[in-house]
Amino acid sequence: MILSASSRTARTGIFNYYVTKGQEDQSWFDKAVADFNKALKVAQKKDDVYYNIAKLMHAYQLSKPEKTYKDWTYDTALKNLRQAIAIDPLPVYTQLEGDILFAQQDYAGALAAYEKVNASNIASPATFFSAAKTKELLKADPKEVIVLMDSCIARCPQPVTSAFAPYLLERAQMNLNANQARNAMLDYDAYFKAVNGQVNDMFYYYREQAALKARQYQRALDDIAKAIELNPKDLTYKAEQAVVNLR
């Protein structure tokens, strides 16, 4: 029979438990492998089993184990995942493919996977952000990266809520990289609003940097003054204030 979503979730939970226990005693990994092999024999939806194997191997490698258990490598995770994709090329499988390739620093391959996901029905702020960061690592034109971040933020709740606000900070930095300082300021302002003004001295310092590049000198002065107020011991802020005053 085809496993229900709840059954698949329960199975993933069990295997995650094995991996957690395996950090202390590798014999638990043997039990996880045995369960996976059993699932492959009885499951009608074998792609789901291959996907879960790949997902666990990926998570295991991200934990940076001191000694890798048997063949639980990124390469093996990718091999299992592509068996799942061969059976049923679901976008969620392709997303994990992108994550594994990203972890292997195969950024071109990861970007190709993320682009497929972004053309699917599971496209989300997170998937567009993954594509943007990958393209950034490929040294693409900063404006191309911003286009992806625009799509990321367009898929966030509007106005952007605090849970999604970090994307605004990311785009602000990308706008600065693209020499679009005024747009960076707008992103910082939107972030400030999204988190109801709950920001620290570093925020004011970064927004001051954007204001300075945008030649908004009074705003730059106001922000660096606020940074100093919140953290008067940081000499960097006082040096920056002196620079702005010279303008």
Model-derived features: where do they sit?
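Register position in tetratricopeptide repeats
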Residues: 16-20, 59-60, 103, 137-138, ...
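Canonical tetratricopeptide repeat
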Residues: 9-11, 52, 96, 130, ...
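Start-of-helix register in tetratricopeptide repeats
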Residues: 4-7, 48, 55, 90-93, ...
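Short coil turns that delineate tetratricopeptide repeat
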Residues: 2-5, 44, 87-89, 122-123, ...
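Residue-level recognition of tetratricopeptide repeat
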Residues: 11-16, 55, 62, 99, ...
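Canonical positions in the second alpha-helix
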Residues: 38-39, 83-84, 116-117, 152, ...
